[in-house]
């Protein structure tokens, strides 16, 4: 039985195994507190995320189970990886991942990025997305604060808690507004991996400009700002809108012409502007894919087709439509944790 140590962080009890020391708070999210720590086993710094009360409701239980399954399945250099997981005596769940020193949001607010850093960061984002999308996973909440970076400029995408299967009947507002694809705002029901390409395009533009491209005050203002630059959405895109209210709103907007991005980004590399034009397209089906973007001339210094892997198998989303009680989710979660630790579940009492 592992020995647990208790610590108070921001008034929250952290119960961690004695393997981890030097707890320091690094961030607070909607679903948990994140601390940095030192792993005594490896000597490496790690991030420990406490999922608060994961078994309090079926919705929270399912969300935690989904995040755990995704962290276990996704294995790629540009995606955050799980190094340990445990349940404390108080029945909180702790995910342990590698610790990277900063994130893109902090970098962007501290200083302008030079061209080679912009290229290298965008390359790694798209390399990670190519893999994630090949696994049948959509991130849905890609933004600078979800993109971690270390001192070697290695980049990893994190926070897959909102990620969901590529299927119709998608739920509405999930990603931070500035980076949200128009089809999430307009269609509500059906969207696919292209939403991540839009978000990556917004992040790319922010790296080029040093400020958010579409800083909407609310979703109405957000959509209006997008049309000021990209023009009115094409009629075939408007016809995909499911909500009557949304349709009326879009049709009420003044007709606008697209402004060439070369006018907006006057000092940018023309190849960068060309790639951005292909990422920020209203019609998701005409948006460039991650694999296609990697082969674009702007990323030629880093592009290596032999080292841009796809997933070995699709992620199994069969659990995602299940409407199960907390106790069932708990048993499934325990089973996943035992599997992660390579424990024979027939021999081990929970």
From Swiss-Prot:
Its main location: cytoplasm. It is found in: Cytoplasm; Nucleus. It catalyses: L-seryl-[protein] + ATP = O-phospho-L-seryl-[protein] + ADP + H(+); L-threonyl-[protein] + ATP = O-phospho-L-threonyl-[protein] + ADP + H(+). Disulfide bonds: none annotated. The keyword Transferase applies. A motif (TXY) lies at residues 171-173. Keywords: ATP-binding, Cytoplasm, Kinase, Magnesium, Nucleotide-binding, Nucleus, Serine/threonine-protein kinase, Transferase, Virulence. Its EC number is 2.7.11.24. GO terms for molecular function: ATP binding; MAP kinase activity; protein serine kinase activity. It is an enzyme of class 2 (transferase). ATP binds at residues 26-34, 49. Transmembrane segments: none annotated. GO terms for cellular component: nucleus. GO terms for biological process: stress-activated MAPK cascade. Gene3D superfamilies: Phosphorylase Kinase, domain 1 (3.30.200.20), Transferase(Phosphotransferase) domain 1 (1.10.510.10). The active site is at residue 141. Belongs to the protein kinase superfamily. Ser/Thr protein kinase family. MAP kinase subfamily. HOG1 sub-subfamily. Proline-directed serine/threonine-protein kinase involved in a signal transduction pathway that is activated by changes in the osmolarity of the extracellular environment. Controls osmotic regulation of transcription of target genes. Involved in environmental stress response. Via the downstream MSN2 transcription factor, may play roles in the regulation of growth, conidiation, trap development, fatty acid metabolism and secondary metabolites biosynthesis. The TXY motif contains the threonine and tyrosine residues whose phosphorylation activates the MAP kinases. This is Mitogen-activated protein kinase HOG1. It comes from Arthrobotrys oligospora (strain ATCC 24927 / CBS 115.81 / DSM 1491) (Nematode-trapping fungus). The gene is HOG1.
């Amino acid at each position: 039985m592992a020995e647990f140590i208790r610590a108070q962080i921001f008034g929250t009890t952290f119960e961690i195994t004695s393997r981890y020391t030097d707890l320091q708070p690094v961030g607070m999210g909607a679903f948990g507190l994140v601390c940095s720590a030192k792993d005594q086993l490896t000597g490496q710094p790690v991030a420990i995320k406490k999922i608060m009360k994961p078994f309090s409701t079926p919705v929270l239980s399912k969300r935690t189970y989904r995040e755990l399954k995704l962290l276990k399945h996704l294995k790629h250099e540009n995606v955050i990886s799980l190094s340990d997981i445990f349940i404390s005596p108080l029945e909180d769940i702790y995910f342990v991942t590698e610790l990277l020193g900063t994130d893109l949001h902090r970098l962007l607010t501290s200083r302008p990025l030079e061209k080679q850093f912009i290229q290298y960061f965008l390359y790694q984002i798209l390399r990670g997305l190519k893999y994630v999308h090949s696994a049948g996973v959509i991130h849905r909440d890609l933004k600078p604060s979800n993109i971690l970076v270390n001192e070697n400029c290695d980049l990893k995408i994190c926070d897959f808690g909102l990620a969901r299967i590529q299927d119709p009947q998608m739920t509405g507002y999930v990603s931070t507004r500035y980076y949200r694809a128009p089809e999430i705002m307009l269609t509500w029901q059906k969207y696919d991996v292209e939403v991540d390409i839009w978000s990556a395009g917004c992040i790319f533009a922010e790296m080029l400009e040093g400020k958010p491209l579409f800083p909407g005050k609310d979703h109405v203002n957000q959509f209006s700002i997008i049309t000021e630059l990209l023009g009115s959405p094409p009629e075939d895109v408007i016809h995909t809108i499911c909500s009557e209210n949304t349709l009326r709103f879009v049709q009420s907007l003044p007709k606008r012409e697209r402004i060439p991005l070369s006018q907006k980004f006057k000092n940018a590399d023309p190849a960068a502007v060309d790639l951005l034009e292909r990422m920020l397209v209203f019609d998701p089906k005409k948006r460039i894919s991650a694999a296609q973007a990697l082969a674009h001339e702007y990323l030629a210094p880093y592009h290596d087709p032999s080292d841009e892997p796809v997933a070995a198998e699709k992620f199994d989303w069969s659990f995602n439509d299940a409407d199960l009680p907390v106790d069932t989710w708990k048993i499934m979660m325990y089973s996943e944790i035992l599997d992660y630790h390579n424990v024979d579940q027939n021999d081990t009492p929970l």
